[in-house]
């Protein structure tokens, strides 16, 4: 049963999680990367969207932990378009899970395939597994969907005050500008720490 859903995101001084070209989120310090790994250790499963996986060339692993100690590595893809040579499929780590509502044949991939949309998969995760804490690392469209479902309990932000991306086509934490959420979501600032090189680490809790 899922007890907690977490977000871990980096955003620029103007609230953008990437540039308009969707460049990799590699603009923060080593201390921020260490913090990300510490946050991952809180999770039983990590979830990202396909575009984020591709842009950041993610393995979704935690250094120093055996594969048995690693959280599940989960990727959601609407069309089932994945590269079998991606580092995600070539690295040792937690079990791989692909979530897709597509009818694409993904049986050749070294992963468990879930023919669900996001809400269906989350329901399955909640009722059929022992996963208690789910961590989402983006992208913005996936984050917006979780906010729409009102499932986000904790938000970990890294504020990279040294960078400004600008532009309507640079995604914010809920993706590109679009429809409003069905209702406002309310959080309070729980932790604020100064990091390195003009970065600040913030943690928000629901309610």
Predicted regions and their residues:
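Enzymes that bind and transform nitrogen-containing heteroaromatic metabolites
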Residues: 1-207
